[in-house]
Amino acid sequence: IVMVRIADLDPISFGTEIKKKYPKKPVILLAFDESEIKQIPIKITRDSINRIFIWSGDASVFTAIIKYIEDKINASKDIIDSDIRAILIIEDSPRTYSKILPFIYKEIVFQVKHLMKKNLSLSQKILYLRGRPKVLLTTNYEGAKRLMRKYQQNIIGVISDVKFPRRNIL
């Protein structure tokens, strides 16, 4: 997780350096608001930053970032191989998905814990929680279409404001 305000180093250059050394490591940019992102002189690409999140004062955004990365990395294996369900979120605003994801993850964990039997062992509870629905985030029509095709049998819901880019046009 990279902050915008790093002394003597812009976050894009820092993210690019990390990606050169560790190409598969996710790099997340955490900004205080959209104006910080607009002040960055270089265009943000996947070669430097995987996703931008906005800090709104709620520490649960960190848990959401970690779960988002876990779901992104494990989605294919868990959904296809283990028949785990998924929720597709189509949202192009970092501020919006930074607020929605913590809420969704909290609710999913709450519901899974509610369904758990009280007499399960700790290892069984952990296994049960790992089987929670995965959350798939995309920011545009093409990404949503790709994910729907790939996981169509396992998508249990789609959350969207129905206002997102298609062919880079909003």
Predicted regions and their residues:
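Conserved phosphotransfer microenvironments
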Residues: 1-27, 31-42, 49, 61, ...
